[in-house]
Amino acid sequence: MAHRHFPALLLALVAAPAALPALAQDAASPMPVKVVVVTMFEIGQDTGDRPGEFQNWVERLPLDEPVAFPQGYRDLRLNREKGVLGMVTGIGTARAASSVMALGMDPRFDLSKAYWVVAGIAGADPEDMSLGSAAWAEWVIDGDLSHEIDPREAPGDWPTGYTPLRHAEPYAKPVPENDEGARYRLDPALVSWAYELTRDTELQDADALSELRQRYVNHPEAQKPPMVIKGDNLAASTFWHGKLLNDWANDWVEYWSEGQGNFVTTAMEDTGTLQSLTFLDKAGRVDRDRVLVLRTASNYSMQHEGITAAESLSGEKKGGYSAFIPSLDAAYRVGSKVVLELAGNWDRYADTLPGER
């Protein structure tokens, strides 16, 4: 398929730093990429300081070659020998969608067979997941696309002020067929393969995390040590928190997945990423079936017993992001097993998805 490239993009590439000439001059013969690692934020530099989601990948995989990416949120990183490309999208669905689309249309890369591994931290439903754990999602549901009225003005029998697009009541049936990007289902066989490959991964734990987990006395899953699980993701650009919104998230995921999904993690980007990958798939630029979403628990999505949602969100009674560093570590430990397996056995996975074998 012939690809058109936007003039503005080509101008941006021409203007890329001279320190990175090779990729900028290879548009006529794009570099095949085996795996794209998608992270959402970094705190400072790519290496050597307090880490965000990207730094472990840069230092440990490693992603040792910087690649100018002026049309995106942050420059890319590449391991040329392994064929692995890493990116930071920026926080929120808008930046994620824009950055992924910019990469997908970048003429320097052939992404037609690339696997995409989204690896980031998230809030976790204590009913299903413990701090420091990792969850592979099959369903990714958008938490922004909706109608909304303030629940204080809603009818008394409404459980929420949110209603699905094109419906006038919460959770009205039938579920809209034209969902406008409200739901995405990843390839179930690929997700199961990733889970089976990584389910026995040893994850970081600490006494402070164990102490916090034990405060969730009515949530047995929240009290368990970190582990790898399967669980679905709600993506919304609003950082919400608290029991009532946690109940809404469970109902919203159940509704849009038509009872097949279970809300486990909450993050801010993944429907934006998947929307762009869906469009890029239509253009023949990527394979939408080669996408995995891994989210690790940096905090719980609701308060434990004895404190309010506001206190929990502000961290007034300990907690907050107590699992920040362990969750970053888990995203790399678990995600890298999949990335290295795919990239290291490319003759096996280039033309056949793992779950299809």
Region locations from a protein language model:
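Accessory terminal and edge-of-domain segments that mediate assembly/interaction
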Residues: 25-357
